[in-house]
Regions:
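Intrinsically disordered, metal-sensing/regulatory segments
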Residues: 6-275
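Short, aromatic- and glycine-rich surface loops/edge beta-strands on solvent-exposed regions
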Residues: 1-3
Length: 275
């Protein structure tokens, strides 16, 4: 672009596309994208459950620690995105306070859910209950991922949206494995339970693509991400408590520490595909 004084300015502009209206075709299209990004990878991750159930108790603890590492990375990644998004909000909304409030509310909500599940299954959180909490935390994060994908397509960032789809699909396979890890302790897991966990963790990505595609609004991003932060951190606390009671040798063993670091490394590596 050249100004009237002859000064040239270079700026990349996203491809011009019509913002999609709410039609049956667009709803189906965004829904398919959300399914591919959220539900399908979670199912593929859960497919590792038979192998995990045959593993030694130390390796089961390692995979639980890996789940904690996955969610720790998810929490800090989402927190960074939440603060980045709140920086662009009007000052009247008090973006920083909004983010911290979202973290606190979601953390307290998951604490309540944990107490209810523990009361239903016994004094301590069972593997099934822990898997449910992990699925909830991942589902809230996938809501934010779907929002990012839907928004990128709605504003014309077609290449970015495509890269996000591929990256998040790979990313979420690891998260499906994280849900499967607590279930390895269960003597029997029924198919409806696995289907329910896959929907809890993956279906929010579908809702996120719809919201991002049809309601292009930066104000929604910060609270969604902050809610994911609080949920993920609360689930990590639950996993650590579970490992402290059940892991052979406690939290300081090489299997537990190595599993945690491996979880962080996996999420960082797959996250490069969406960066």
């Amino acid at each position: 672009m050249t100004s009237s004084t002859g000064i040239q300015t270079t700026k990349e502009i996203a491809a011009a596309v019509e913002t999609p209206g709410v039609t049956g075709r667009s709803i189906l299209g965004y829904g398919i994208i959300g399914f591919l990004v959220g539900v399908l990878p979670i199912v593929l991750g859960l497919a590792w459950l038979p192998s995990l159930r045959r593993a030694d108790a130390r390796w089961t603890s390692a995979f639980l620690a890996l789940t904690a590492g996955l969610l720790t990375f998810v929490a800090f990644d989402a927190l960074g995105e939440a603060f980045e998004l709140q920086a662009g909000l009007p000052t009247s909304l008090h973006g920083t306070g909004l983010v911290l409030l979202g973290v606190a509310v979601s953390s307290l909500a998951l604490t309540f859910v944990t107490a209810r599940l523990s009361g239903r299954t016994g004094a301590s959180t069972s593997g099934s209950a822990l898997a449910t909490l992990v699925a909830i935390g991942i589902g809230l994060h996938n809501l934010g991922e779907g929002l990012a994908i839907g928004s990128s397509f709605a504003i014309g960032e077609l290449v970015l949206g495509t890269f996000l789809i591929v990256g998040f699909m790979i990313h979420n396979i690891a998260e499906g494995l994280g849900i499967a890890a607590p279930l390895a302790e269960q003597s029997k897991v029924k198919a409806p339970q696995l289907a329910g966990l896959a929907l809890v963790a993956g279906a929010p990505a579908i809702a996120g693509t719809w919201i991002g595609g049809f309601l292009v609004n930066d104000i929604l991003g910060a609270p969604f991400m902050s809610i994911a932060v609080g949920a993920a951190l609360q689930v990590v606390v639950g996993i650590v408590r579970h490992l402290a009671r059940r892991a052979p040798g406690g939290l300081g063993t090489g299997h537990v520490l190595g599993g945690f670091l491996a979880g962080v490394a996996v999420m960082y590596t797959t996250g490069l595909l969406t960066g």
